[in-house]
Each structure stands twice: as structure tokens, then as C-alpha cells.
A protein has these predicted regions:
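Alpha-helical junction/boundary sensor with strong preference for TPR arrays
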Residues: 128-132, 171-178, 228, 232, ...
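Single-pass hydrophobic alpha-helical transmembrane segments typical
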Residues: 47-89
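N-terminal mitochondrial targeting presequence
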Residues: 1-60, 446
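Fungal C-terminal region signature
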Residues: 300-446
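Intrinsically disordered, low-complexity juxtamembrane tails/stalks of eukaryotic membrane proteins
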Residues: 87-281, 285, 300
Length: 446
């Protein structure tokens, strides 16, 4: 029996198996460590290229990097501005009203076009009425005040006055009809404070050179001051009689004007009386306003200087009643006061005392609280002390103070002070020159 025939099929089978094992295989994937090493190599290549690029073009690469940072920062800041000044500014308005106001403010603040701005303000007020907004809300009153402000900015003082007078009239009518209702107590306080502010602004506008109606200015300011003082007295009476704390009173009646706001109304009326040379009325108002400011405040320096100037320019008879006016709750008469006649020397001495107090207070105020009012106030107070010394016949003291005032004014960049003190010094030395009225301080603007 032969076994030879089996060898061929076996060899063929083995050959077939070998052919199966010889099929092409896919390359094995990189294991995880190899992948990580490859990524590191690529990262290293990028870092190397960046370093090489920086070495070749250090300025260009730095500028490009700064430009990218600036662009990213600009986008972030633009988003902040949009949310803060575009969206948040109008969140109390219904969207149809807000749309009109955005256009109005664009033509007010960005591309000044009074005609277009007024058109959109009117449309905003019309839409506000249609959607049922309260015409005496802070938002609607604010729109009307903004219209008056726009008129003032383009020097249309008459139209600004007209807008504010209409607004004042409407508010007073609401106070007359609904202000005494029990459920309107908080709203009454808020609207009354608005009318006081509007009246003070009207007093300022009536006193502007474009209009210059001093009687109307005085009328509006007297009303504002009397209203402020009467309301303060009324609230004090309620607090005492009902045994309420200030917090409880605010909850029931609403917040009233701050001391600073009250002082501003008193000061505005005082300046009006000064312009009319009614210093016996201006002095107590300056004194009352001063009592409402903290002793270490730069504006207190301004008030002390103006009080000193006003005292020095009073007639002796009128000065006798200053304290009575200062302690009164209301201003009830514009007639000249009567009483024992003060001497000229006592008036000047009182004025000197207040000027020196202004210097003492200014010396205690340090940055960041200290501002331009303190710096200019020092120059003015020193100049006034020189004038008071000159009026009392103390020529050498006056000369020394004038020189000191010039030095202070020059150091703080107060050119008017340099000019005024230099003129008085020349007059004192007998080289000519004319002195004017006593220097007073106005709060710096801008």
C-alpha cells in the first residue's frame, strides 16, 4: 500500500495556509504614549516656530500681539458699554418708548441735531402716553427735563424756560389735586422735591444774560427755599409728635431732599440777593447753607468766603438782623430788617473771622477729598483778608496779604485771582489801579 498520493494534497493545503498567512496586514495604530509624544513634538514645533518668528521680527510680532489684545479688549468694552449705557439706561421704559429715546439721545449726545432730537423726544412722550406710563413718574419727568437741558445747550434759554415752566405747572396742579391723599404720601414727597429742583433751575435760567429777569429768578428761588424749609419743619413735627424714627418716616413719607440739595437751594437764592446788593438777605442764607455742609468739605470754604464778602458789603443797620434771619425757618419778607445798628468795624471784623475760618478749613482738607474749590478758596480768602485789613487802615498787613494772595493764585493757576490781587496791590502802593468789589468764590465748573 502506497502513501505517496497524499503528499500532494497536504503540500497544497500547507501552501494554501501559507498564502492565507501572507495576506497584507494593516499597520498597527500608535499606542497612546506614542500619540502623546507626537502631539508634544507638534507643540514643540509651534513654539519653536513662534520663537523663531519673534527673533526675526520682534517689533511686528509684539505689535500684532498688542493688536489682538486691544481688539479683544475693545469687544469686551463695547459689550460693557452697550449693557451699561444702552440697555440699562432704558430698562425702566417699555421697549417702544426706549426705541424712540435711543434715537433722541443719539441726536443729543452723539450727532447733535436738535430738530431730530426733539422729534424723537416728542414721539417718545406720545408713545409713553399711549402705553399708559405715569406722566409724573421719574422717567417721564426726566425726559422733559432732558428736553430743557438740550434747549439750554443750544442757547435757546427761552424755550428751556418754557419747557420747565409747563412741567412745574403740571406738577403743582397734581400736588394740589392729589398730593394730600393718604395713598399718595410717598409720591407727593418725590414730586415736591422735583418741583423744588425745577424752580432752582428756573431761577438760574431767569438770571442768565440771555433772559436776565431778576425778579422772576428771585420769585422762583424764594419759593424753592421756603418750600424746602417748610417741608423739613413739617417732617420734623411728624417725627416728634408721632414718635417716629427717621427710617420709619422715610418709609411712610418717602425720602426728602438731602442736606447738600437743601444747601444748594439756599446758596442759589443767596447769590441772587448778592447780585441785587441785598447782602443783608444773602448773608443768613450763606450761613444756613454752611450749616448743612460738613466742616471739612471744600465747598464749606466757598461758603465761608462768600459769607465773609457778603458781611463786608452790608450796611451796618442791615447787619444787625443777620442772626435772626439765619435762625428763621422761612423767608417771609424782602424788606430791609430793623434793629440795633452795628458798627462798620464790627462788620469787617466778622468778615475777617469768616475768611480766616475758610483758610483754616482748607488747610485740613487733604486729597482725595481736596479739590479745586479748596485751592481757589485759599487764594480768595487771603485776598479778602488783605482788603479787610486795607479797610481798617492796616496798610502793611494788607500789602503782605496781597502778595501772599498773588503767590497762591499763581500756584493754583487762578488767573483772575492774580489779576485782582495785583491790581489792589498797585492801588495800595500808589501806582494807580482800581479795586473792585470783594472777591467771592463760585464752585468750579467742568
Amino acid at each position: 500500500m502506497s502513501v505517496r498520493p497524499l503528499s500532494t494534497p497536504l503540500r497544497q493545503a500547507v501552501k494554501h495556509l501559507r498564502s492565507l498567512h501572507s495576506l497584507s496586514r494593516r499597520s498597527r495604530p500608535l499606542n497612546p504614549p506614542q500619540c502623546l509624544r507626537q502631539q508634544h513634538r507638534r507643540a514643540g514645533t509651534f513654539t519653536t516656530n513662534a520663537s523663531s518668528l519673534f527673533r526675526q521680527n520682534p517689533i511686528s510680532v509684539s505689535l500684532a500681539f498688542l493688536a489682538i489684545l486691544a481688539g479683544a479688549g475693545g469687544l469686551g468694552y463695547a459689550n460693557y458699554l452697550y449693557k451699561t449705557y444702552i440697555t440699562a439706561a432704558f430698562h425702566n421704559y417699555p421697549e417702544p418708548v426706549a426705541q424712540k429715546l435711543r434715537r433722541a439721545l443719539y441726536y443729543t449726545n452723539t450727532e447733535l441735531n436738535a430738530q431730530e432730537a426733539i422729534k424723537y423726544y416728542r414721539q417718545a412722550l406720545q408713545v409713553a402716553q399711549e402705553v399708559g406710563m405715569d406722566p409724573f413718574s421719574d422717567e417721564i419727568i426726566g425726559v422733559k427735563v432732558q428736553v430743557a437741558k438740550l434747549m439750554e445747550e443750544i442757547r435757546q434759554m427761552g424755550k428751556a424756560v418754557q419747557v420747565l415752566e409747563f412741567l412745574r405747572k403740571d406738577c403743582l396742579e397734581w400736588l394740589r389735586q392729589a398730593g394730600e391723599q393718604e395713598h399718595n404720601r410717598v409720591k407727593r414727597t418725590r414730586i415736591l422735591a422735583k418741583v423744588v429742583g425745577i424752580s432752582v433751575k428756573l431761577g438760574e435760567l431767569y438770571g442768565s444774560p440771555e433772559i436776565y429777569q431778576r425778579d422772576l429768578a428771585e420769585e422762583r428761588l424764594v419759593w424753592a427755599v421756603e418750600t424746602v424749609l417748610k417741608e423739613r419743619q413739617r417732617r420734623d413735627t411728624i417725627r416728634v409728635t408721632e414718635g417716629m424714627s427717621e427710617e420709619a418716616l422715610v418709609e411712610v413719607e418717602g425720602p426728602w431732599m438731602t442736606d447738600s440739595e437743601t444747601g444748594a437751594a439756599l446758596e442759589a437764592l443767596a447769590h441772587t440777593y448778592e447780585e441785587k446788593d441785598q447782602h443783608y438777605l444773602a448773608s443768613p442764607l450763606f450761613l444756613q447753607a454752611l450749616n448743612l455742609y460738613p466742616t471739612k468739605d471744600c465747598h464749606a470754604v466757598v461758603l465761608m468766603n462768600n459769607l465773609a464778602s457778603s458781611l463786608a458789603q452790608q450796611s451796618p443797620r442791615a447787619a444787625a438782623a443777620v442772626d435772626a434771619y439765619a435762625s428763621s425757618a422761612t423767608i417771609t419778607s424782602l424788606e430791609a430788617p430793623t434793629g440795633p445798628v452795628a458798627t462798620r468795624e464790627s462788620l469787617i471784623q466778622n468778615a475777617s473771622t469768616w475768611a480766616q475760618k475758610a483758610l483754616d478749613v482748607a488747610a485740613t482738607v487733604q486729597p482725595p477729598t481736596r479739590n479745586e474749590e479748596c485751592d481757589i478758596g485759599c487764594a480768595v480768602a487771603t485776598h479778602n483778608l488783605a482788603e479787610f485789613a486795607e479797610m481798617m487802615g492796616r496798610k502793611e498787613d494788607a500789602r503782605r496779604k496781597y502778595v501772599e494772595a498773588i503767590s497762591i493764585a499763581r500756584a493754583v493757576g487762578f488767573e483772575d485771582g492774580v489779576e485782582n490781587s495785583s491790581a489792589r496791590l498797585r492801588g495800595l502802593a500808589g501806582f494807580g489801579g482800581r479795586g473792585g468789589k470783594h472777591t467771592k468764590v463760585d464752585a468750579p465748573t467742568g
